Amino acid sequence: MRQGIGTLSEKTVHAVMKNYYAPDTDMHEIPIENFVADIYTGQEIIEIQTRAFNKMRRKLDAFLPLYPVTIVYPIPHIKWLSWINEETGETSPKRKSPKTGNPYMAFIELYKIRPYLSNPNLHLKLALLDMEEYRLLNGWSRDKKKGSERYDRIPVKFAEE
């Protein structure tokens, strides 16, 4: 699996969102209560979470009694896919995905942190992003696309915030 580009092995979407919400890198990756906050402004914590909200529970237990916490959830709105051949390094021309993201896609992740949703210190930002996604041609189907591994996603535009 490819490692991320930035601090703590983060990938492009995470790094771009972090720099968008806090251009001052002194606010990035701040240790608080045995955890590392993506962004700490001095008054609030901002966590960029691209998936797996269930992994946030222990962090929320530590952060919410101390500070307001905003979870930013980037959702792919319009996505262009390109495929990377692992053997040759060749990248296919991009094509538009038939799926269009919307805020309702957050419900599955929000369900994983439902006990925290009524906490007045918890805030959510759903960021709809148009993005380019690169996938490896390493899946199990004949054309190697089904079950393939996502290599990276690159945001190209904020569709809605």
Stretch-by-stretch model annotation:
Residues 3, 88-91:
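Residues lining hydrophobic/aromatic ligand-binding pockets adjacent to catalytic sites
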Residues 70-73, 125:
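A structural signal for short, well-ordered beta-strand segments and their strand-loop junctions
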Residues 1-36, 110-117:
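Acidic-basic catalytic patches of nuclease active cores, encompassing PD-(D/E)XK
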Residues 92-161:
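Long, low-complexity, charged/polar intrinsically disordered regions in eukaryotic proteins
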Residues 80-88:
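Glycine-rich, charge-decorated loop segments at or immediately adjacent to ligand/cofactor-binding or catalytic sites
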Residues 74-79:
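Short beta-alpha junction loops
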Residues 37-52, 56, 63:
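Conserved catalytic cores of phosphodiester-cleaving nucleases, focusing on short active-site segments
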Residues 52-68, 99-114:
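Short, charged, amphipathic alpha-helix that recurs within catalytic cores of restriction-modification
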